[in-house]
Amino acid sequence: MIYEICANSYESAKNAEAAGATRIELCSELGVGGITPSYGLIKKVMDELSIGNCVLIRPRSGDFTYSEEEFDVMLRDIVLCRELGCQGVVTGVLLHDNTIDVERTAKLKEAAGTMEFIYHRAFDCTPDPIVAIKTLKKLGVDRILSSGGKKSAIEGLPLLKELQRIGNGKPMIMPGGGINAESIVQIKAAGFVPSKVAVRMVTCIPCGITHCP
């Protein structure tokens, strides 16, 4: 089982490493669902810790439809993460109808280079998750974080299992949302090897999903 922890500070990243977590999703401002952490925080974690570090790329709170200027910031942040040697980036971009923004997602993935490219729970806002996973599969996304469209991954297990079947490991489906020591047993029983464990859950995005992106 792979354990990933949302870390919103150097201290929480250090604690996650000490507790034996496999990797972290580094972000700031969990109170609004997480936004891109500062360059200084990313560099300190990369310089001083050995835990795998996937960085959230989200320029602001709110929805996942971004202006040209916001998108440019996202591209620049991804390049910085690549230059610092981060394991991956966690991001997501939607069109105004909440479908996957194919063109921009492709550009973000290209900017990521050889880093892992993880599509976050913006996925759970899409109107048709089956179409969405097929789209992301064509784009070569490595992982998708999802609660199966529900407030918790346990509630969303039926859809998560179907997504896992369609993805067939590429992209890998990572259950996220409301996961704790008890629910991990159910997640494993459903056939999922990796599972995202977020230390705090918040509600921030328009579709009302309780999450850490």
Residue ranges and their predicted role:
Residues T22-I35, L80-H96, V141-E155, A190-P213:
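Glycine-rich phosphate-binding active-site loops on the catalytic face of alpha/beta enzymes
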Residues G34-S61, I100-A122, E155-A181, P213:
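Alpha-helix-loop-beta-strand connector modules within alpha/beta enzyme cores
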Residues M1-S9, I57-L75, L94, F117-P129:
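Active-site mouth loops of central-metabolism enzymes
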Residues A18, D47-E48, E83, E110, ...:
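Residues at the C-terminal ends
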Residues E11-A19, T65-I78, D124-L139, L160-G169, ...:
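Catalytic cores of alpha/beta
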Residues G85-G140:
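Hydrophobic, well-structured mid-protein blocks that either form specific transmembrane helices
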Residues M1-I24, E29-T36:
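N-terminal pre-domain/capping segments
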Residues Y3-A7, I24-L26, N53-I57, V89-T91, ...:
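Hydrophobic faces of well-ordered beta-strands that scaffold small-molecule active sites
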